């Protein structure tokens, strides 16, 4: 059997797996130090009681011969699709356009597989590493990095003379923590329509947006229905990281160049490749949507971001993002240190594990990412260490 040639283009280790190995090695060699890990975007707050109760009740029903059930609908429970349409999208996305999945990352893989190999895929730089790896694994003909630089407020720079088939766009952004406003998002949508580009819009952090003027969905721009697909997740807002539940929106108006409707092929694709997300997870998701606007976990993580920002600014770092996302994009000021050494510096001097920006792409060079998804006691301890230890010096 021949090896899949696309694996040749991957790095040996996935970024976050490699970081955890380095943290484990440091702990082994320095048992006297307690490492605070702010490198991974993993949730730390427990499930809301009503969500946990819905989950447990659903599992209990599966244990009874009178209420147990087998496969659920391929496209998701009607109750969950309808509640997302009414409560999350306020009716501007129809329930039939919402497809429930087992997570945003796997949906990204499904979508790029669905559209087939030999596509030219554009990705923000810096960006979540899975975009690049999945584009490679699914046989992208060309992958174009769109620089998102500090001097341009991390807004992507689009090429003038290169055709793009698919644009992966994330807002609120991972890793920069910044969010596109309506004018910026509208400009990207119109650019996509003009250049016949499909946007895969990752809105996994949209529930962190607190400013009502900022778009939580690309479909707040009406024309996006002709050029975009949206991916979202229950992982961060509801603490479903280990439960796995997400969704994808395919607008009914979206067509291929030949006029055929994408949603028809997507339904056929899912019927063949997917038997539906976990029923207990979906029923817990219905309960979670009822409390989402008042969810304490989101406020908790926002407060973590505020604490980290104040400590980092007081220590002499430049800080971006974090207001509408659980990530802070941090730049050491007056420093002359290589990207390779940034991770080791924070681990050695502060005993804090962060993510070096270069791991998210070339344009991440010189930055590091802090996650605010940790426990409050760890965030407070990290803030204390940042203020006591020496800042980077040139």
Swiss-Prot record:
It catalyses: (2S,6S)-2,6-diaminopimelate + 2-oxoglutarate = (S)-2,3,4,5-tetrahydrodipicolinate + L-glutamate + H2O + H(+). Keywords: Aminotransferase, Pyridoxal phosphate, Transferase. InterPro entries: Aminotransferase_I/II_large (IPR004839), DapL/ALD1 (IPR019942), NHTrfase_class1_PyrdxlP-BS (IPR004838), PyrdxlP-dep_Trfase (IPR015424), PyrdxlP-dep_Trfase_major (IPR015421), PyrdxlP-dep_Trfase_small (IPR015422). One of its GO terms (biological process) is lysine biosynthetic process via diaminopimelate, diaminopimelate-aminotransferase pathway. It comes from the Bacteria. Its cofactor is pyridoxal 5'-phosphate. Its EC number is 2.6.1.83. PROSITE patterns: AA_TRANSFER_CLASS_1. Substrate binds at residues 14, 41, 105, 128, 174, 275, 369. GO terms for molecular function: L,L-diaminopimelate aminotransferase activity; pyridoxal phosphate binding. PANTHER family: AMINOTRANSFERASE (PTHR43144). Involved in the synthesis of meso-diaminopimelate (m-DAP or DL-DAP), required for both lysine and peptidoglycan biosynthesis. Catalyzes the direct conversion of tetrahydrodipicolinate to LL-diaminopimelate. Is also able to use meso-diaminopimelate, cystathionine, lysine or ornithine as substrates. Belongs to the class-I pyridoxal-phosphate-dependent aminotransferase family. LL-diaminopimelate aminotransferase subfamily. HAMAP family: DapL_aminotrans_1 (MF_01642). This is LL-diaminopimelate aminotransferase. It comes from Chlamydia trachomatis serovar D (strain ATCC VR-885 / DSM 19411 / UW-3/Cx). The lineage of its organism: Bacteria, Pseudomonadati, Chlamydiota, Chlamydiia, Chlamydiales.
């Amino acid at each position: 059997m021949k090896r899949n040639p696309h694996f040749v283009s991957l790095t040996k280790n996935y970024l976050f797996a490699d970081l955890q190995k380095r943290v484990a090695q440091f702990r082994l060699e320095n048992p006297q130090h307690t490492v605070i890990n702010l490198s991974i975007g993993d949730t730390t707050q427990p499930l809301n009681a009503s969500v946990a109760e819905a989950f447990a009740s659903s599992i209990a029903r599966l244990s009874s011969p009178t209420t147990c059930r087998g496969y659920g609908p391929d496209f998701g429970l009607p109750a969950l699709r309808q509640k997302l349409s009414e409560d999350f999208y306020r009716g501007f996305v129809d329930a039939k356009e919402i497809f429930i999945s087992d997570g945003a990352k796997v949906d990204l893989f499904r979508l790029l597989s669905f559209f087939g190999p030999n596509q030219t895929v554009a990705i923000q730089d810096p960006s979540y590493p899975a975009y690049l790896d999945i584009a490679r694994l699914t046989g992208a003909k060309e992958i174009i990095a769109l620089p998102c630089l500090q001097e341009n407020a991390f807004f992507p720079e689009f090429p003038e003379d290169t055709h793009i088939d698919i644009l992966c766009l994330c807002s609120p952004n991972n890793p920069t923590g910044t969010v596109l406003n309506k004018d910026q998002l509208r400009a990207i949508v119109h650019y996509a329509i003009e250049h016949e580009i499909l946007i895969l819009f990752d809105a996994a952090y949209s529930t962190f947006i607190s400013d009502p003027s900022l778009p939580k969905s690309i479909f707040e721009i009406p024309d996006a229905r002709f050029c975009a697909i949206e991916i979202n997740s229950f992982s961060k807002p509801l603490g479903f990281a280990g439960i796995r539940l997400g969704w994808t929106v395919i607008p009914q108006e979206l067509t291929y160049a030949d006029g055929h409707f994408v949603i028809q092929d997507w339904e056929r694709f899912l019927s063949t490749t997917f038997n539906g997300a976990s029923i207990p997870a979906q029923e817990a998701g219905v309960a979670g949507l009822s409390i989402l606007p008042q969810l304490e976990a989101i406020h908790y993580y926002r407060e973590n971001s505020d604490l980290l920002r104040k400590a980092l600014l007081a220590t002499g770092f430049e800080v971006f993002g974090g207001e509408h996302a659980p990530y802070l994009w941090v730049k050491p000021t007056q420093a002359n240190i290589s990207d390779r050494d940034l991770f080791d510096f924070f681990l050695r001097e502060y005993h804090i594990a962060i993510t070096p920006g270069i791991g998210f792409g070339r344009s991440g060079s010189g930055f590091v990412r802090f996650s605010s998804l940790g426990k409050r006691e760890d965030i407070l301890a990290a803030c204390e260490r940042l203020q006591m230890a020496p800042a980077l010096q040139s």
